[in-house]
Every structure is written in C-alpha cells, then in structure tokens.
Design a protein with these regions (language model features):
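Hydrophobic/aromatic ligand-binding patch that stacks against planar heteroaromatic rings
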Residues: 31, 65, 86
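Structural motif
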Residues: 35, 68, 89-91
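Glycine-rich phosphate-binding active-site loops on the catalytic face of alpha/beta enzymes
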Residues: 1-11, 41-53, 84-117
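Electropositive, surface-exposed helix/loop patches at the edges of structured domains
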Residues: 21, 35-39, 78-81, 86
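Histidine/lysine/aspartate-rich catalytic loop segments that bind and position anionic ligands
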Residues: 22-51
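Alpha-helix-loop-beta-strand connector modules within alpha/beta enzyme cores
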Residues: 1-25, 53-81, 114-119
Length: 119
C-alpha cells in the first residue's frame, strides 16, 4: 500500500509489465482493481515469520477475493502442504509460497508435492 501508484508505475514500466499490489482486506482489493493493477496478493492468509507483525487475514478474505476479484489473485502467507487444500477450497486457484519450499528438507520434492496438489 505504500508503493508507487499503479498509474505512475505503468508510466515508468510501460504497458507490457505486470503491476500488482499486496492487499489485506476487500476494500484494498477493490481499490487495486480501480487503480488498474494486473494482479493482487491476498494475505497473509496465515501467520508467517516472513511478515512479522502482520495479522493474518484468514480464509474468509481469500473466499471474498475468489468471489469478487476481476483480476488474478495469489493467496500468500503461511501456506504449506498441510493447509493448501483449505486455501484451495475457498476458490483460490493460485498461491505463493516461500517457507514451504525454502525450509523443506528436500525443496525440489516439496515444490513437486505442492504443484501436484494444485493440479
């Protein structure tokens, strides 16, 4: 929410680059759509040390995004194999993960497992 306005980013980057915004509430998602964002991040869904101090938005906001977003969105924040299905059950079809892969004993296998769950 503190980054360049999407219109200014578009002027600087041109029409071919994708511009996104992190959102933490439905009103922010709606504003991102009005502002011309190409996609949004929705989260953090769960508590995560990669976003310390950020309250999780939970599955209700992901469900709202799935119902109302006219642009692609990525559920993000504390998503891993153990809770991925619950995120997908909200209607989300795209997720972003960090620790589920980077902190896995076998990151390549963790990535394959997550991709299989997304099929």
């Amino acid at each position: 929410q503190g980054d360049l306005p999407p219109a200014l980013a578009r002027q600087l980057l041109g029409p071919e680059k994708l511009i996104g915004r992190s959102t933490h509430a439905l009103a922010q998602l709606q504003q991102a759509m009005r502002d011309g964002c190409d996609y949004v991040g929705v989260g953090p869904v769960n508590a995560t040390p990669t976003k310390p101090g950020r309250e999780p938005v939970g599955l209700d906001y992901v469900r709202q995004a799935a119902a109302e977003s006219a642009i692609p969105f990525f559920a993000i924040g504390g998503i891993e194999g153990a809770n991925l299905q619950a995120v997908l059950d909200t209607g989300a079809t795209q997720v972003a993960v960090v620790r589920a892969i980077t902190e896995a004993a076998d990151p390549a296998q963790a990535a394959r497992d997550l991709l299989e769950m997304l099929q």
